Amino acid sequence: MIYLDSAATSLLKPPSVVRATAMAMRTMASPGRGGHSAAMRAADTVFTCREAAAELFHVPEPERVVFTMNATHALNIAIHSLVSPGDPVVISGYEHNSVTRPLHALGAQVRVAESSLFEPEAAVSAFRRALPGAKAAVCTMVSNVFGYLLPVREIAELCAAAGVPLIVDASQAAGCVAFDAAALGAAFVAMPGHKGLLGPQGTGILLCFAQPKPLLCGGTGSQSVLQDMPEELPDRLEAGTHNVPGIAGLLAGIRYLSAQGVENIERRERRLAQRLTAQLRTEPRLEAFASLDPACQTAVLSVRCRDMDSELLAQKLAHYGVAVRAGLHCAP
């Protein structure tokens, strides 16, 4: 199989990720739920992964790294921490349903900072116009449909100047685009473990630079006499048993990325995307949605066939062993 669907889930994991996940299932119990060696081994792995993620994203305190089920879970925590029913919230025009559906469910007044594709200056201007009076803002770092790298740093500066807390969706950026999460100045940064971080499905991370509200309540293995969730991170948000095998695999994925260098991965992926785009544009039947400015384009690439439905094209490619995704990509 030629696997070209890593924007949904990375399939070809490093062997170290598979080994670490399997080893955790054989040798690790639950962190904070016992003093025996299997529980202590699990606790050490979870903490080490927290430290590794903090180092990768330049987070000064590892406890600000909260493990979640996926990016959707992380975004829901962030949104429910900042948004109340009726609040005006600014979003970009490229957000995933993991942003738009929670906002709709909360009854937020959503303002879309609309801007043309691959025009970062227009995106900044759109946010500048939409921010006054907003209670929160959400912006994806990279569009999961077009691979468009939005000017999140500039948008974050606008939000800070306006006193509007920002949530950054780094689902398509984490592990593929080098960035300093702490320097962004965002309230929260959400990401999955199973895409660019090369971890197993069922893993995610929320980087917390503001005080969050728990989305789930339950056992934390700490401060059990309290009726409410602990105030301290990460326990405040990590109710219930951790996905220890997933976190062990995620740790191996992060270590692989750190050894390779995210900057090197980013350069290689962009070169490959540019080569593919150039080749696709030699075929008159195909339309490739990619920026001419490599600074705006990541390795996520959308293509349309002018005389064939995209679903049918994906089926034909699957017949030849090429895995792609067609449709709205959860971002209509």
Enumerate the predicted regions with their spans.
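Pyridoxal 5′-phosphate
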Residues: M1-P332
